[in-house]
């Protein structure tokens, strides 16, 4: 009897972020990682939401264009932009800039836009969504902020607070429809998109998808 099983398309995470990779691994589904080569500079006059959505879609499309897959691929692109006092907050890159970020946000609310795109190369369809998270920071002594930074070295994280680690101690409250959005990959939105693309999330084993 011929094999009539319809196999799902290859799933690719378009990201170099170890945090996003760790989140996607929670779902227990097979995927590959390809880092997009993309200029992530915001456009003049672009809102934080527009920047995040544009970059998430651009990452997914850029990676899809490099993949030779006759059966198609599903590519996950994600981008996060933080905004505070009307300005976009980037990744600090250094200890000094991270400390300055945290000091400026003491007792204040920061808005995080976690944009997600699922691009289906079979149809050319791109599902996109922006999940907004409001975060209120505690007021802490600068010495504690410095100690946190030396412990976590979150210099590749927008806003300098890694909520999945010790950074949670910097926060008073998190308000979001998706608890994984703040870490960088909104899994509630992603699983909704995968279902819409007919991806079999509940296959019993990895072998069922091979």
From Swiss-Prot:
GO terms for cellular component: cytoplasm. The record marks 19, 80, 164 as: Important for substrate specificity. The keyword Cell cycle does not apply. Keywords: Cytoplasm, Hydrolase, Nucleotide metabolism. InterPro entries: ITPase-like_fam, Maf-like. Gene3D superfamilies: 3.90.950.10. Its cofactor is a divalent metal cation. It is an enzyme of class 3 (hydrolase). Its EC number is 3.6.1.-. GO terms for biological process: nucleotide metabolic process. One of its GO terms (molecular function) is nucleoside triphosphate diphosphatase activity. The keyword Transmembrane helix does not apply. Pfam families: Maf (PF02545). The active site is at residue 79. It catalyses: N(7)-methyl-GTP + H2O = N(7)-methyl-GMP + diphosphate + H(+). It is found in: Cytoplasm. Belongs to the Maf family. YceF subfamily. Nucleoside triphosphate pyrophosphatase that hydrolyzes 7-methyl-GTP (m(7)GTP). May have a dual role in cell division arrest and in preventing the incorporation of modified nucleotides into cellular nucleic acids. PANTHER family: BIFUNCTIONAL DTTP/UTP PYROPHOSPHATASE/METHYLTRANSFERASE PROTEIN-RELATED, BIFUNCTIONAL DTTP_UTP PYROPHOSPHATASE_METHYLTRANSFERASE PROTEIN-RELATED. This is 7-methyl-GTP pyrophosphatase. It comes from Burkholderia lata (strain ATCC 17760 / DSM 23089 / LMG 22485 / NCIMB 9086 / R18194 / 383). The lineage of its organism: Bacteria, Pseudomonadati, Pseudomonadota, Betaproteobacteria, Burkholderiales.
């Amino acid at each position: 009897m011929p094999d009539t099983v319809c196999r799902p398309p290859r799933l690719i995470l378009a990201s170099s972020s170890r945090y996003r990779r760790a989140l996607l691994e929670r779902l227990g589904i097979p995927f590959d990682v390809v880092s997009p080569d993309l200029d992530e500079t915001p456009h003049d006059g672009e809102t934080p939401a527009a920047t995040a959505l544009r970059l998430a879609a651009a990452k997914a499309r850029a990676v899809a264009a490099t993949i030779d897959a006759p059966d198609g691929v599903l590519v996950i692109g994600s981008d996060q932009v933080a905004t505070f006092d009307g300005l976009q907050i980037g990744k600090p890159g250094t200890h000094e800039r991270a400390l300055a970020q945290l000091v400026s946000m003491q007792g204040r609310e920061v808005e995080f836009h976690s944009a997600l795109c699922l691009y289906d190369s079979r149809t050319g369809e791109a599902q996109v969504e922006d999940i907004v998270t409001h975060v209120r920071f505690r007021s802490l002594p600068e010495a504690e902020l410095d100690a946190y930074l030396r412990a976590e070295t979150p210099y590749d994280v927008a806003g300098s607070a890694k909520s999945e680690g010790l950074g949670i101690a910097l926060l008073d409250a998190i308000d979001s429809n998706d608890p994984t959005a703040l870490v960088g990959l909104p899994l509630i939105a992603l699983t909704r998109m995968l279902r819409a693309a007919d991806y079999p999330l509940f296959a019993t084993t990895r072998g069922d998808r091979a």
